[in-house]
Each structure stands twice: as structure tokens, then as C-alpha cells.
């Protein structure tokens, strides 16, 4: 909770600075001179409220959504020795990372994958695919679990949601400025907002949202290196490298993780060229090399 409060305070400061900057550069006067009567401060606050509301709501229901979308079965009472080992391993890693033990689950998927989610590092969920349990060695599975525990301990789910909230705020803000400008200056709408405002705003939100997603994905990729580093500390560098190498050998297996969980899985598939800017995970080769440099 403290992380959320501190991050929200930081982002409120960003919104305040943005408002002051627009005023200092005379943006309000520029808009008024062109016939656009728009209170930018009120608009910025409105966009911040709705931008963060959607992001934080998604965060608070993330565990429930993850279970529903992946078919994850929570292990409350282990029925097999593999489930017993899984619970014991997560319990040990959580203790070493200084967090409360998360819920542990298995989801039915042939692909080798795992994810962590939850609004609080002491109220999280870690789940692994059936395919990963069947084909990976115990050391490799432990390293994957350590990576996911690293996400939880670092508070990555909260931070990523709040970064998304900032992005949402400014996408909504600038899309509405563009919509008002086109409506008032180009189409000369005098009373209220014309159809041009709504069409332009929707189009601008789509374009700006697409471009802004590259910022969120850049942050997500940085976050993966930190989780790999945490995994190496908890399970050993050799085991973490081995798990990533094993994932690399399975890159031909389609990744069917729901879009809402892709950023929280250990394996997100492979994209090349400009599409790489919109990847939630760095290439496995870069992650392996970073761990080797770590020593």
C-alpha cells in the first residue's frame, strides 16, 4: 500500500508540473487565441482520475482475472509429490525474498510458461504451466519460480499498473486537446462539441495509445532484467541461465498466454524489427548475456 501511495504522490506531482509548464509556456493563451475555450487544469485532473481508475481497477482484480482467463487451479492441499514440491519450493523462495507466501497454482497449457500477479506483494499469485512442470528439470522450475517471486518482491505489478495510469492520463489529455483544436479551429464549431471532436479524439486516442504502449513495454523489459537478477540470487545464476536457455529451445512452441498476462509471464514469444519495441520481454539472448555478465 505504501508503494501505491508514494507512486500516486509522485504522479500527482508530475500532473502538477505538467499543468504549471503548460501555463508558463502560454498554452492556455494559444488555445484561447484560436477559439478553443478549454480549461487545461480541469482537463488534466479529469484525465488523471479516469486514467488511473482503469489501471488500478485492473490491478485489484488481476488475481481473479488471471485465474479465470488461464484456468489456473490453486493448490490448497497438494495431491501429488510434484504439487507438494511446488508448494515447498515457493514457500522457501518467498521466505528468502522476505514476502508472504503467495497462492500457488497450475494452469493447463502445453507451452512452458509461468506468471505472477496480484495487487500486493503479500497477496499475490504465482502459477506455472503444466508443460513447464512436465518438461523442465527441478532446478529449472525453481529458477522460473524464483524469477516470478522476484517480480512479486520488486512490486512490479503495482509499478507497471501505475506507469500505465500515467500513460493513460496523458493519452486522454492530448487526444482531447487535439479533438478540441480540430473541432474549433478547422471545422469552426461554435457551440458545444461537434462530431469532428468525437471522431478526432477517438482516432487520436488510438494512435497515441499505440505509440505510448512502447513506453510501457520499455519499462516492462527493464523489469524483466531485474526479475532475472532476483531469480539468480534466489535460485543461483547457473540455474537461472539454464532455465532461460531451456525456454529458448522451446521458442517454436506457440505462446497462448492471455494478453492481460503476457507482461507477467516469463516467456512472451519473439518479435523482430520495430515490433520488438512493443515486446514486454527482452530477447532471451540478451537476458542470458546479462546474467553471464553478472557472474
Curated annotation (Swiss-Prot):
Gene3D superfamilies listed in its UniProt record: Metalloproteases ('zincins'), catalytic domain (3.30.2010.10)
GO cellular component, one term: plasma membrane
EC assignment: 3.4.24.-
Entry keyword Protease: yes
Keywords: Cell inner membrane, Cell membrane, Hydrolase, Membrane, Metal-binding, Metalloprotease, Protease, Transmembrane, Transmembrane helix, Zinc
Residues reported to bind Zn(2+): 147, 151, 224
Protein family membership: Belongs to the peptidase M48B family.
This protein's name: Protease HtpX
Species whose genome carries this gene: Pseudomonas syringae pv. syringae (strain B728a)
Lineage: Bacteria, Pseudomonadati, Pseudomonadota, Gammaproteobacteria, Pseudomonadales
